[in-house]
Amino acid sequence: MVSESHHEALAAPPVTTVATVLPSNATEPASPGEGKEDAFSKLKEKFMNELHKIPLPPWALIAIAIVAVLLVLTCCFCICKKCLFKKKNKKKGKEKGGKNAINMKDVKDLGKTMKDQDDDAETGLTDGEEKEEPKEEEKLGKLQYSLDYDFQNNQLLVGIIQAAELPALDMGGTSDPYVKVFLLPDKKKKFETKVHRKTLNPVFNEQFTFKVPYSELGGKTLVMAVYDFDRFSKHDIIGEFKVPMNTVDFGHVTEEWRDLQSAEKEEQEKLGDICFSLRYVPTAGKLTVVILEAKNLKKMDVGGLSDPYVKIHLMQNGKRLKKKETTIKKNTLNPYYNESFSFEVPFEQIQKVQVVVTVLDYDKIGKNDAIGKVFVGYNSTGAELRHWSDMLANPRRPIAQWHTLQVEEEVDAMLAVKK
């Protein structure tokens, strides 16, 4: 008995110890990392089990996964872009506000600029003009002349003595000067000096006479114009000057030098038009010119009319072969003639001849002045060449055409050209 109870007492403590140890093991908390790993492994296990249940091959599953990833990435990209766009709009708004904001420095600068402009307006200067220096006047040379009046014969005597320091208008560094002298306002009578070749200091020593009653002289102006002669084109004006007759003392002879001024640009004077027909018969070698009419002729007489008639010259190589004239039509600027003239021209010569038509104003006392001139045939151009060509293309048929009259000197220069 004693031994049994002793054994129980000895065995009891270990039982109690075990009991106390077990509870401590059971209630010990699990670490957070271990819990998460268990949850993830459970989800993975579950997901894999579900995948195994789907009746699809592995490659199809991979494709679906890739598409899903792409969709996610696209969504992310769109969200980012939207955010960036909003930021940019905000920035723009700030900049706009900055631009519209008034800068006091700019206002001051603007005020200063406006003040400068007002100052310029008062003085009448622009920026370019402020810096520009006054240009020197172009020197055109000078002319020495003399004036006298013959009271006994009612004549104005104009002497063209010499010119000096003329500008060079020709290629060789010289000019071919001559002087034109006329009275305004009528311009009816014009005089010209001889042409002096290749010189800038010509000596003329020529005198011209205008028959003008002294009572009418005060209302006239004398013009002296220096020209450069050109054989093949229009003569260039070098310079001119005007002398009002009411400023001249005719109690003695006036002799002086005057500087040439730039000539006023004169409009091409209208001289009028003429209509004539041409007819050529090659077999007979006969050229017929019919002067039909003229219109709007230049006024040549004091009464504002003219006494026009027409001269026709047949020319070859600068020589006048034949000359014909119409009748004179009195006091008219629109004469009607209808007069026919014939010339013998062999067929082999027709391409070498020229028909020169000149309208003149008849004057009983003095020289008959040319109103205007035109020529057809060899070396002609424009409307004149077309008229001649039409005549040759239509033998035996009269071809009529209107022509504009040209200045006599210009036509003569063209006739002098040899091709």
From Swiss-Prot:
Where's it found, cell-wise?
Answer: Cytoplasmic vesicle, Secretory vesicle membrane; Cytoplasmic vesicle, Secretory vesicle, Synaptic vesicle membrane; Cytoplasmic vesicle, Secretory vesicle, Chromaffin granule membrane; Cytoplasm
Q: What InterPro entries does UniProt report for this protein, alphabetically?
A: C2_dom, C2_domain_sf, Synaptotagmin
Post-translational modification note: Glycosylated.
Q: Where is the lipid attached (S-palmitoyl cysteine)?
A: 75-76, 78, 80, 83
Topology Vesicular: residue spans = 1-58
Q: What does the record give as the function of this protein?
A: Calcium sensor that participates in triggering neurotransmitter release at the synapse. May have a regulatory role in the membrane interactions during trafficking of synaptic vesicles at the active zone of the synapse. It binds acidic phospholipids with a specificity that requires the presence of both an acidic head group and a diacyl backbone. A Ca(2+)-dependent interaction between synaptotagmin and putative receptors for activated protein kinase C has also been reported. It can bind to at least three additional proteins in a Ca(2+)-independent manner; these are neurexins, syntaxin and AP2.
Identify its protein family: Belongs to the synaptotagmin family.
In its UniProt entry, what is this protein called? Synaptotagmin-1
Coding gene? Answer: SYT1
